[in-house]
């Protein structure tokens, strides 16, 4: 084998090892990002909502900092209710469509309907709520009490 081939093979192996250490996104999160993009007609990337205020992103505590952050708290609460119903909202896949009037759900099971409704409500709330750049990546230990 040629030295150049060995280098390429080594590089591929190393990159695969690095990729295996990246945890996968919850299945539903991918669908939720598409609902957000459909609802806001692509005006803001979904990742802007991942670390916003006290509730947008992982966890949440305290008083929401604004209307958009309240959307995230309502979404968190909705997922909590889904869990009480025996659903797994972060893993529940559902059918949805992005029409000219925005996104809508088209699902079969109770859990799919409930989780899709949670995500749809949040996506529409995000689309109508102002985004304040000052509330992105805030110090939650100080502002979320």
From Swiss-Prot:
Q: Name one GO biological process term.
A: phospholipid metabolic process
Q: Where is the active site?
A: 75, 119
Name the cofactor(s): Ca(2+)
Superkingdom of origin organism: Eukaryota
Q: Which CDD domains match?
A: PLA2c (cd00125)
In the UniProt record, which is one GO cellular component term?
Answer: extracellular region
InterPro entries in the cross-refs: PLipase_A2, PLipase_A2_Asp_AS, PLipase_A2_dom, PLipase_A2_dom_sf, PLipase_A2_His_AS
The protein's role, per its UniProt record: PLA2 catalyzes the calcium-dependent hydrolysis of the 2-acyl groups in 3-sn-phosphoglycerides.
Q: Could you identify this protein by its name? A: Basic phospholipase A2 cPm05
- According to its UniProt entry, this protein's organism is Laticauda semifasciata
């Amino acid at each position: 084998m040629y030295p150049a081939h060995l280098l390429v093979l080594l590089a591929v192996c190393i990159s695969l090892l690095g990729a295996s250490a990246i945890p996968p996104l919850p299945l539903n999160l991918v669908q939720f990002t598409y609902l957000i993009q459909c609802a806001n007609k692509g005006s803001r990337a979904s990742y802007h909502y991942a670390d916003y205020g006290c509730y947008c992103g992982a966890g949440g505590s305290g008083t929401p900092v604004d209307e958009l952050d309240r959307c995230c708290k309502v979404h968190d609460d909705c997922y909590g209710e889904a869990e009480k119903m025996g659903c797994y909202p972060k893993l529940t896949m559902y059918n949805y469509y992005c029409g000219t009037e925005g996104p809508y759900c088209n699902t079969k099971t109770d859990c799919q309907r409930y989780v899709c409704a949670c995500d749809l409500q949040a996506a529409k709330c995000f689309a109508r709520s102002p985004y304040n750049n000052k509330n992105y990546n805030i110090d939650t230990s100080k502002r979320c009490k």
